[in-house]
From Swiss-Prot:
GO molecular function, one term: exodeoxyribonuclease VII activity
Compartments (UniProt record): Cytoplasm
Quaternary structure note: Heterooligomer composed of large and small subunits.
Gene designation: xseB
Enzyme class: hydrolase
Gene source species: Clostridium perfringens (strain 13 / Type A)
Record bears the keyword Cytoplasm: yes
Protein name: Exodeoxyribonuclease 7 small subunit
């Protein structure tokens, strides 16, 4: 079965929900630990996704510089 790719915004939303639940204080200790672990997993996925996107932006910027002969857009 293929794993569904989750987009950045939905992961941030899920992380915000976890934070709200933890801040609310209504979870048991076990539930809090499980939520915290899930939050850490989401943060790691977000970091990985941001790193990947940063690399893509770098490639586009490098290609842009090559297309314009290395000239900067500064005046």
């Amino acid at each position: 079965m293929a794993r569904k790719e989750t987009n950045y915004e939905s992961m941030v939303s899920e992380l915000n929900e976890i934070v709200k639940q933890l801040e609310n204080g209504d979870l048991t200790l076990e539930e809090s630990i499980k939520s915290y672990e899930n939050g850490v997993k989401i943060v790691n996925k977000l970091y990985k996704k941001l790193s990947t996107l940063e690399g893509k932006i770098k490639v586009v910027e490098d290609e842009k510089e090559e297309d314009f002969g290395g000239y900067s857009n500064e005046y």
